[in-house]
Amino acid sequence: MKRRTAREKALQALFQIDVSDIAPNDAIEHALDGEKTDAFFEQLVYGVIEHQVQLDEMISGHLVNWKLDRIANVDRAILRLAVYEMVYSDDIPANVSLNEAIELAKRFGDDKAAKFVNGVLSNIKTDIES
């Protein structure tokens, strides 16, 4: 599975977990839709779940005039996924995670999602790199 596909499927699983409160294994199975699983995909899903509190704190600290629970569910899932990659995946450059998140926002979010995701993640990236 290509990494972009793994990210898309991880986003779908994380979104389902967030809005439906279903078990991660069920969300993963549904997102895979019969496809073979992938280590990167599972790392993303389980990593975000494991570190969600820290990820949410980091994201919340970079929101201007927003609260995390008021952000669109898909945007919140994209931010969690990208911040997880930026913080916990040493083999992925932060710019790649940021760009992939913007592409996910363009594909799955509304018209303003990509700009919003870019702004939040750019600030987080700056903090991580400093």
UniProtKB/Swiss-Prot annotation:
One of its GO terms (biological process) is DNA-templated transcription termination. Keywords: RNA-binding, Transcription, Transcription antitermination, Transcription regulation. This is Transcription antitermination protein NusB. NCBIfam families: nusB (TIGR01951). It holds the Pfam family NusB. GO terms for molecular function: RNA binding. It comes from the Bacteria. GO terms for cellular component: cytosol. Belongs to the NusB family. The keyword Transcription applies. It comes from Bacillus velezensis (strain DSM 23117 / BGSC 10A6 / LMG 26770 / FZB42) (Bacillus amyloliquefaciens subsp. plantarum). The keyword RNA-binding applies. InterPro entries: NusB-like_sf (IPR035926), NusB_fam (IPR011605), NusB_RsmB_TIM44 (IPR006027). Involved in transcription antitermination. Required for transcription of ribosomal RNA (rRNA) genes. Binds specifically to the boxA antiterminator sequence of the ribosomal RNA (rrn) operons.
